[in-house]
Amino acid sequence: MGMTTAQKIFSAHLVDEPFAGTKVLSIDVVMCHEITTPIAIADLMARGKDRVFDPTKIKAVIDHVTPSKDSKTATQAKMLRDWARRHDIKDFFDIGANGVCHALFPEKGFIRPGNTVIMGDSHTCTHGAFGAFAAGVGTTDLEVGILKGVCAFREPKTIRVNLNGTLPKGVFAKDAILRVIGHLGVNGATDRVIEFGGPVVAQMTMESRMTLCNMAIEAGGTSGICMPDQVTVDYLWPFISGSFGSKEEALAAYSVWCSDADAAYEQVIDLDLSDLAPLCTFGYKPDQVKSVTEMAGTQVDQVYLGSCTNGRLEDLRVAAQILKGKKIASHVRAILSPATPQIYKDAVAEGLIQIFMDAGFCVTNPTCGACLGMSNGVLAEGEVCASTTNRNFMGRMGKGGMVHLLSPATAAASAIEGKIADPRNYL
């Protein structure tokens, strides 16, 4: 019997199996940010274990509230900063160099097919887009990862999701993953890996694949995975060219991590996206999804474009295409947070930032702040936000606020009209 990508990674990284079904894996990359890591740091220090297993395998960034908004967040940032310096962690990104972790770390080339990746952040599954097993973990597991370079997992079964057809005009990766979550439900992939495949995935950029995998957790998934292919190699080539004689050689090496043709899946789901319309959430769960035509006319107070889901350059490009030469509705606050400094620079060079500002957007530094209601876009009670983020839980972006999740294209159209709007009318 063949193996899935996840099974291959588990087998290659197995260190111990202390209990039936529980496997201790060696970890290739431990990611850290200033919200969850300081808790682990403080506990390790209290127990006299202020050590790291390998500083070259730890990547750290201040990204959630940046610059710090108050003494509490400044203290959290300082703890991470001091810890990184104390342990000579070279890949630490402070104010000015920092970006949203799940956009910044792929941009830096830190992930490879077949890697194991952990972080104290539920959207760590983003990095599965590279053919890695990437999962968010709790504080105790993060501590063990930092100290020993290992982490225990129950080996997850894999759900294969084939995205068939071709995405229609005005429909993007965000719409595709909302369709998947709407089909599975918020608990449909609990303790499972969602392996994305099919013609739609084959046609996607790495940025779009990251959007897919980013929201695997919203269906309960431990991780999302796309099998490595030529698109993966092309994206990674600037970082791996010294290790391979050619892209063909790299592809052959990374293809060993692809699921075998006779791999056994717990479930195989086929979704034809050829007739998919732009989608939008309507409630307080990511699986509460309707077409934009059903949601059209819903008034919004704020539009937010950014986050680890949709703050990348291709997201900004499609939104700017819609916004060029137009103004946002007079009653709407529109906020753009490019996910990394490089994305910001590229957007400036391409004239995108000018388009956003001319339309009436406020452009912030790279930050996660608005997504979790901590800074740079918090909602007041009763306010409604059309957002390209990944969670619409009650109070997620501010106590008493309502969040509608949608694509950058739909967000841009909604900013112009001041209500949920169909982007196909502008493309």
Curated annotation (Swiss-Prot):
Positions that bind [4Fe-4S] cluster: 308, 368, 371
Pfam families tied to this protein: Aconitase
The record's free-text note on cofactor binding: Binds 1 [4Fe-4S] cluster per subunit.
Keyword Iron-sulfur: yes
Origin superkingdom: Bacteria
Similarity annotation: Belongs to the aconitase/IPM isomerase family. LeuC type 2 subfamily.
Protein's name according to its UniProt entry: 3-isopropylmalate dehydratase large subunit
Organism: Citrifermentans bemidjiense (strain ATCC BAA-1014 / DSM 16622 / JCM 12645 / Bem)
Gene responsible for this protein: leuC
